[in-house]
């Protein structure tokens, strides 16, 4: 939102949230836009409640205050639940404001990916390969659980899930 370089120590959101920033939300507000942000975690995480005000957002929707915690993944609300609950809020915003700008902060792709087994999207991480049977000379298809249960495998499952969640979100906004 600002194209700022990170702080040399600490974090901008915690150490420098009270500064004056040139940001996309502020620039768009000068053009008559309403700006909002939403996150499936609480507003105190990375001091977003204060920082988003400094960035010029009119409203910050967050985990504990604005969403029903009905499905968690990792650090907070699952992306599918987050988007499902965000759609009516965004539709209401679009009825009240001709021009608006929104930032949606997802959580599923955030480490750790230990909850990958909770995801309802299936991604086959099985490696398939062919091998010639020495006794018969025939080619056989074999499988191995190549990435199942690994960090990279869990990450790929979370990306697959997030992709499906974004697709459903877009469909729901269009409905």
Show the residue positions of the predicted features.
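Solvent-exposed soluble domains appended to multi-pass membrane proteins
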Residues: 1-175
């Amino acid at each position: 939102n600002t194209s700022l370089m990170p702080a040399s120590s600490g974090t901008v959101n915690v150490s420098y949230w009270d500064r004056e920033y040139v940001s996309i939300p502020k620039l768009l507000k000068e053009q008559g836009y309403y700006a909002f942000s939403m996150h499936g975690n609480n507003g105190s995480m990375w001091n977003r409640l204060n920082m988003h005000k400094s960035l010029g957002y009119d409203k910050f929707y967050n985990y504990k205050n604005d969403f029903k915690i009905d499905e968690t993944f990792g650090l907070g609300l699952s992306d599918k639940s987050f988007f499902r609950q965000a759609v009516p809020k965004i539709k209401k915003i679009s009825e009240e404001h001709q021009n608006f700008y929104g930032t949606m902060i997802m959580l599923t792709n955030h480490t750790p990916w230990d909850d990958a087994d909770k995801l309802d999207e299936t991604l086959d991480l099985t490696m398939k390969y062919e091998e010639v049977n020495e006794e018969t000379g025939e080619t056989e298809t074999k499988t191995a659980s190549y990435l199942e249960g690994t960090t990279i495998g869990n990450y790929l499952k979370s990306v697959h899930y997030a992709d499906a969640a974004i697709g459903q979100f877009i469909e729901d906004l269009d409905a």
